[in-house]
Amino acid sequence: MALKHMQIFLFVAIFSSFCFSITLSRPLDNELIMQKRHIEWMTKHGRVYADVKEENNRYVVFKNNVERIEHLNSIPAGRTFKLAVNQFADLTNDEFRSMYTGFKGVSALSSQSQTKMSPFRYQNVSSGALPVSVDWRKKGAVTPIKNQGSCGCCWAFSAVAAIEGATQIKKGKLISLSEQQLVDCDTNDFGCEGGLMDTAFEHIKATGGLTTESNYPYKGEDATCNSKKTNPKATSITGYEDVPVNDEQALMKAVAHQPVSVGIEGGGFDFQFYSSGVFTGECTTYLDHAVTAIGYGESTNGSKYWIIKNSWGTKWGESGYMRIQKDVKDKQGLCGLAMKASYPTI
């Protein structure tokens, strides 16, 4: 009898030890899998760190971001968009915001309230006459997605994209224009430290226009203005107009006629890792980024959206673009996209 009890005791002890070892191994296995994912991500995005300490620190950030992305994507209902582990996955949200935005929105809005409102040429366009959907890519008025890198000159990319579109609509030629010319030569803005599309339009009008991207290529950093490279001019503008503030219907009228530069709050976590679908994520109306509205439409489930062209490369979003919810309850628009919009005139 004693022998039988001893056998039972040994079996329980061995089984308990086995279960305990499995329990311990699971977190270890998960950690190894995550480390492998980080290494694969580094290879995919060409990320090289200065030393082991930096790599370890970036791994922790990467892990936290991945876990949060996967948690948010697992929410079963109410989310019409997905997030992805993209090229920004080893950056904290604060780091991302400081490196990849650059719209001087707060100062722009405060000064706008003190100035006379500009004319709006589409004011009398009947809403009923507007097309149900617009996509300027299909009409040949949008150049391929560009990448501002870690230079905070989104304002320049937004302004240039709007001018590229207006030029194609007016002259029938789609020309890739120079953002670097604005970064280097527009002294009313701040290069990689940020700027505003309206002041960029003013600079372009005053200096006679923009040259091509190939003539004055993008470097992703501030440099001295090379006046020789600013010529010959590929296009010019007569000025710009602001879209009435906090009015998505007015914005729709403008976008139906041409691509429009738009200020937006693009520094949030959901925006950082947006991958696909109609964006309805968390954001504020503190404008910190600039994009270009190039269309609008409605998905098969009835979700209305804007199409925006970003300047973070093709690995972000829907090959560099985002569909973001349109006609929301808040008059400012989702992420404030109806607060500060403007377009060039040719």
Curated annotation (Swiss-Prot):
List the disulfide bonds in this chain. Answer: C151-C192, C185-C225, C283-C335
- This chain is glycosylated at N124, N301
Q: What happens when the gene is disrupted?
A: No visible effect on senescence.
Assigned GO CC terms: senescence-associated vacuole
- UniProt-listed Enzyme Commission number(s): 3.4.22.-
Which one GO biological process term can you cite for this protein? response to UV-B
The record's annotation in SUPFAM superfamilies points to: Cysteine proteinases (SSF54001)
Summarize tissue expression: Found in senescent leaves, especially in senescence-associated vacuoles- (SAVs) containing cells (e.g. mesophyll and guard cells), and in senescencing ovules of unfertilised pistils.
Entries under Pfam families matching the protein? Inhibitor_I29 (PF08246), Peptidase_C1 (PF00112)
Its family? Belongs to the peptidase C1 family.
**What does the UniProt function comment say about this protein?**
Cysteine protease that may have a developmental senescence specific cell death function during apoptosis, heavy metal detoxification, and hypersensitive response.
Name of the protein = Senescence-specific cysteine protease SAG12
Species assigned in the record: Arabidopsis thaliana
